Structure formats: C-alpha cells, structure tokens
From Swiss-Prot:
Residues 1-5, 58-73, 213-231, 448-472 are cytoplasmic. One of its GO terms (biological process) is lipid modification. This is Membrane-bound acylglycerophosphatidylinositol O-acyltransferase MBOAT7. Belongs to the membrane-bound acyltransferase family. The gene is MBOAT7. It comes from Homo sapiens.
Length: 472
C-alpha cells in the first residue's frame, strides 16, 4: 500500500470512534465539532491547498444569495468550472494540489451543487405557497430555511465522508443534527454487520495487487506475453480495484453508522444519497424511538454482492458508488440534452469522467459504457424473450460473464489513465470489448430489438442470486 492509501485508511478508521463520541451530542456540538474535525483533517492533509475548498464554498454561497431561484445551474457551472482551474494549476505554473485536496474537492463539488438545488427547491415551494395563498404542511426533503454562511461551512467541512464519501444532502445532514432521540438509534450492531467482510476484502486486495501489479502493464515485457495471458490480466486488476474500494467505502459507511448519521426508520424507504422517500413523523418519546426499526440506506455507497453478481452493465452502475450514482441521476441525467436513455447515459458518463479528472483514460472508459448499454439493451430485447426458461437462465449467466469482462476492460483505462497506456493495452487484446459490443448492437438491430429506454426493467433479471442471498 502507498503512503496515501495508509493515510486514507487511518482517516477512515479514526472516524469510527469519533462517530460514537458525536452520536449522542446536541445539535450545536455535532455541527461545530464535526466541522472542526473535518477542517482539521483537511488542513492536515491538504495544507495551504485548503484554500481551494474555501473559495469554492464562498463562491457557491454568493450565488445562492444572489440568485436563489436559479442557483442550481449556476452552482453546477461554478463548481465544475473551478474543477477545470483546479486541475490546470500545474499548467499555469502554480503549486499542484495534493491527492487529498483533489478528494476533498470532488466530494465538496457534489455537496455544494446539491445544496444549491435544495435551496432552489425551497424558494420555488415558497413562491407556489405565496401564489396559492395558503400554507401547506412540511414537504418531504424540503429545507426549513436557507443556510447561513456559517451553516454552509459546517456542512461543507463536516468530517463525515469528507474525502471518500458517501455523499449526503444538506437535508440528511440537518436530520442528523436534529435527531430527536439519538441514543435510541442502533449503531454497534449495524456497524459490525456492515464491517465483517472488510478484513477479507483487504487481504484479497493486498494479495491480488501483489501478484498482479498494475505497473507490469506499462512494461514492454508484458506485451511479449501470449494473448490469453494479456486478456486474463485485466481480471485480477479489476478484482484488486474492487476490493480496494469495497474496503474504503465499507469503512466510510461504518464511520457514518457509528455517528448514527443517515439513520432513518425503515418505513421511510430511504434511498442511497437521496434519503427518505416517504414521510415518517418523528418519534415522540425515547420508547417509541427505540421501538422503530432503522436502516442506513441513505449513506450506503456500495452493494458488493450485487456489484459482482448483477447481470447487466446497467445494473452494475447502480450498485457501485451508490450515493454518487444518485447525484448523477438527479442532477445530470435528468437534465441531459437528449431523451434517449443511451444518449442521456453518454452525457452523464462524459460529465462523470470530467468530475473524476482530465486523464484520457477516464473518458475512454466512461464513454465505452453507453456503447455497452446500447448493445446489451438491443440484443437482450431481441433474443432473451424468445428463449425457454432454461435458455433465459443460460443467457443470464453468459450476460453476467460478458458484463464482468466489459468492466474488466473499462477498468484498465480508469487505472492506466494515460491515452498511450490505455490504447496500448486495449490494442494488445484487439479492442475485443468494443468489437464485441458493436457486433451485439448490430445483431440486435438486425433482429429488431428495441432501445434500452423502451424496455420494461421489471421483466429483466437484476442478479443471478436469489433475493434472500443478497447483501444486507
């Protein structure tokens, strides 16, 4: 493990006992204590580069104050424009930020765009209320008022997920501060239930990254290996990639669970990133609070089992980095300048690649996804329904195998980063996934398959495993 990875791991692990300390604290101590810890971590890991996050926060807050009814689009333009400046610092002869600064900036961008959207929703709701002449009851997810500058700073620097996620909305943060009976919210058991696979994933990461180092792909000797060996190598590279993020995101979720952050009654049917989808009245006593069943779906960032065993490329995106996927769906996909599912996905993947960075490998990887989505959608709608139940089961296994190979292939661009290294590796295996996807798309079109946006998702398999075997 690199020194940076050790630093991330230490930050994630210390957030767990800190969470237990904050869990039963009052709203004021939670707000300012969590912000102080987060700011301290930022200053320690980023040093003077912390200024970038402060400038981004102040700029967004100014836009919210100036144009509250249209601040969402303005905040999106501002934060994404600042990302370009932030990544071009070395080209401008300015000090290059640390990797930790980049991580803070990425999560901060998501939070500030979401905050601006929540403020805009509040103002639009107030306008409708004034126009109608009567007051409605509390609306699900709506903010009570516009956050002040200090409240915006406290949300932005809250230590929870400050470098690794999960992403959370200001409404989720506010609900944590105002939990009526935090002592009744379970933490220890959910934490242990969530944490148990992490040590195994960590060992698998260390073993796979040692046996199949990524650096080998950059060496000339690698390309003297036979084709089957070159094809196989992307499988353990993606395996190590998954194990690394599984450990990081499980640890990050455990930090949230320790603090009771993102806990809602099961009846609220919370979604990762978005929070509750149904209104649930707060409990009126500690006894009633203790009698409720809670979950932490709001801050769930990874479904490891479904990521590995879902059938389709489309579903693989849903279970990976789940809170960020919600953000992309809510703020990018829905406003995409197209109606087609594949074109909307291409737009979303383009901006997702930009959010990750300027390395060509990100764009090569992310922009392969829409081709795979179009191919699997057309071919599946053309052929799967014509098969017997046994044939459909066999289809799903083959589809799953190809889905995993597609992600193996795309992962190589994500980790190799450079244009030359990515294309060199893909060329060494003859761009097999690109050609396979094009062939599947052509066959699906020839057989009259419909576009993915017109297919009924309910009739399609999402996982090879029975529901009862899926990850809790």
């Amino acid at each position: 493990m690199s020194p940076e990875e050790w630093t991330y791991l230490v930050v994630l692990l210390i957030s767990i006992p800190i969470g237990f300390l904050f869990k039963k604290a009052g709203p004021g101590l939670k707000r300012w204590g969590a912000a102080a810890v987060g700011l301290g971590l930022t200053l320690f890991t980023c040093g003077p580069h912390t200024l970038h996050s402060l400038v981004t926060i102040l700029g967004t807050w100014a836009l919210i104050q100036a144009q509250p009814c249209s601040c969402h689009a303005l905040a999106l333009a501002w934060t994404f424009s600042y990302l370009l400046f932030f990544r071009a610092l070395s080209l401008l002869g300015l000090p290059t930020p640390t990797p930790f600064t980049n991580a803070v900036q990425l999560l901060l961008t998501l939070k500030l765009v979401s905050l601006a959207s929540e403020v805009q929703d509040l103002h639009l709701a107030q306008r409708k209320e004034m126009a109608s002449g009567f007051s409605k009851g509390p609306t699900l997810g709506l903010l009570p008022d516009v956050p002040s500058l200090m409240e915006t700073l406290s949300y932005s620097y809250c230590y929870v997920g400050i470098m690794t996620g999960p992403f959370f909305r200001y409404r989720t943060y506010l609900d944590w501060l105002e939990q009526p009976f935090p002592g009744a919210v379970p933490s220890l058991r959910p934490l242990l239930r969530r944490a148990w696979p992490a040590p195994l994933f960590g060992l698998l990461f260390l073993l796979s990254s040692h046996l199949f180092p990524l650096e080998a792909v950059r060496e000339d000797a690698f390309y003297a290996r036979p084709l089957p060996a070159r094809l196989f190598y992307m499988i353990p590279v993606f395996f190590a990639f998954r194990m690394r993020f599984y450990v990081a995101w499980i640890a990050a979720e455990c930090g949230c669970i320790a603090a009771g952050f993102g806990a809602y009654p099961v009846a609220a049917k919370a979604r990762a990133g978005g929070g509750p989808t149904l209104q649930c009245p707060p409990p009126s006593s500690p006894e009633k609070a203790a009698s409720l069943e809670y979950d932490y779906e709001t801050i769930r960032n990874i479904d490891c089992y479904s990521t590995d065993f879902c059938v389709r490329v489309r579903d693989g995106m849903r279970y990976w980095n789940m809170t960020v996927q919600w953000w992309l769906a809510q703020y990018i996909y829905k406003s995409a300048p197209a109606r087609s599912y594949v074109l909307r996905s291409a737009w979303t993947m383009l901006l997702s690649a930009y959010w990750h960075g300027l390395h060509p490998g990100y764009y090569l990887s992310f922009l392969t996804i829409p081709l795979c989505l179009a191919a699997e959608g057309r071919l599946e709608s053309a052929l799967r329904g014509r098969l017997s139940p046994g044939g459909q089961k066999a289809w799903d296994w083959v589809h799953w195998f190809l889905k995993m190979r597609a992600y193996d292939y795309m992962c190589m661009g994500f980790v190799l980063l450079s244009l030359a290294d990515t294309l060199r590796y893909w060329a060494s295996i003859y761009f097999c996934i690109h050609f396979l996807a094009l062939a599947a798309l052509g066959l699906g079109l020839a057989l009259g398959g419909g576009s993915p946006s017109r297919r009924k998702a309910a009739s399609q398999p999402t996982s090879l495993a029975p529901e009862k075997l899926r990850e809790e």
